[in-house]
């Protein structure tokens, strides 16, 4: 049994070539929910959905977001209607009192659907509507995710990191903003001064997540701050990782990041934006998989390979390196 911690696109790209190395039936994926937002009244869970769509064989592999060949009639009409009415596209937060009203899972990250600032496809939207409706019927996010996973025919077990609200808030010179506003709405601007995982001090992992963390854990080459940071900010997840075997794949080659905002976010929270900084962020890691061009010295065993993840063959190669690293420390 093995458990992958997933956020962003790094770990999903690794999972795309994992089946011949780690049996899907014996694999659990715990996904970040700090990036989730409520948009136009519907809960959008980007990191859960990337794995849901990947394993459901409908993921758009060009963007690693949304459903391949999806239409966007509703999104287009929302934009047209806002333009016709002279409404600013935002991102538009709901009023402060609305941020902590209603369903708890969406606290501190509620946005208006006026000219929605995230591109939501029509089939993708159906998932968000179904998820939110099931939550409003009284089900937990874990239970709803299980229902959606069954609908998409997943063999791997997919779990949210918690059923409690945790929101990734980026602190900037322009004030605090949710990660999705900073990354999607503002293209990674302004500069990062700090990152807060609001609600993490009161959140707990579910029994299902803690059971999964009893198994060997793999952290893919995802962003250590906003993809993994919300999980690590939950005390019982942090404790569990210190008590199990963990192998991590660096998203850097020395100080060059493969993609995404990891470097800016790491610098913003006082971590060196490099493989060395990733190792500092993961003090519980028993071994690392690094790129063959990465000579960073670490205090734990290292397996090196080409860590490029452009296709399934690349992903299988990196998974084989993870398997080797696990064999050395298990």
UniProtKB/Swiss-Prot annotation:
InterPro entries documented for this protein: CofD, CofD-like_dom_sf, FbiA/CofD
Swiss-Prot/TrEMBL catalytic activity: (2S)-lactyl-2-diphospho-5'-guanosine + 7,8-didemethyl-8-hydroxy-5-deazariboflavin = oxidized coenzyme F420-0 + GMP + H(+)
SUPFAM superfamilies linked: CofD-like
Pathway listed: Cofactor biosynthesis; coenzyme F420 biosynthesis
Enzyme class, UniProt record, top EC level: transferase
Biological process terms in GO annotation: F420-0 metabolic process
Entry EC number(s): 2.7.8.28
HAMAP family from the UniProt entry: CofD (MF_01257)
Subunit field text: Homodimer.
Protein name: 2-phospho-L-lactate transferase
């Amino acid at each position: 049994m093995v458990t992958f911690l997933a956020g962003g696109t790094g770990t999903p790209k690794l999972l795309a070539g994992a089946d011949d190395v780690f049996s899907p039936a014996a694999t659990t994926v715990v996904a970040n929910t700090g990036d989730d937002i409520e948009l136009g009244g519907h809960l959008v869970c980007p990191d859960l959905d990337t794995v849901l769509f990947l394993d459901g064989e409908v993921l758009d592999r060009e963007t690693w977001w949304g459903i391949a060949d999806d239409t966007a009639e509703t999104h287009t009409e929302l934009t047209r209607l806002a333009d016709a009415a002279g409404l600013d596209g935002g991102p538009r937060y709901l009023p402060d009192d609305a941020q902590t009203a209603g369903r708890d899972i969406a606290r501190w990250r509620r946005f208006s659907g006026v000219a929605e600032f995230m591109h939501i496809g029509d089939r993708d939207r159906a998932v968000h509507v179904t998820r939110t409706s099931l939550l409003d019927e009284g089900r937990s996010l874990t239970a709803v995710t299980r229902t959606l996973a069954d609908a998409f025919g997943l063999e791997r077990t997919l779990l949210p990191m918690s059923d409690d609200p945790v929101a990734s808030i980026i602190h900037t010179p322009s004030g605090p903003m949710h990660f999705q506003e900073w990354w999607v709405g503002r293209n990674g601007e302004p500069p990062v001064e700090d990152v807060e995982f609001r609600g993490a001090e009161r959140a707990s992992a579910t029994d299902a997540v803690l059971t999964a963390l009893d198994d060997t854990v793999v952290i893919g080459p995802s962003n250590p701050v906003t993809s993994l940071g919300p999980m690590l900010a939950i005390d019982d997840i942090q404790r569990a990782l210190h008590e199990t075997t963990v192998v991590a794949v660096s998203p850097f080659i020395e100080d060059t990041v493969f993609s995404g905002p990891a470097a800016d976010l790491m610098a913003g929270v006082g971590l060196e934006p490099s493989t060395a900084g990733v190792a500092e962020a993961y003090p519980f890691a028993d071994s690392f998989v690094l790129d063959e061009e990465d000579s960073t010295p670490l205090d734990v065993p290292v397996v090196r390979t080409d860590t490029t993840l452009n296709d399934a063959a690349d992903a299988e190669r990196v998974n084989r390196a993870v398997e080797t690293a696990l064999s050395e420390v298990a």
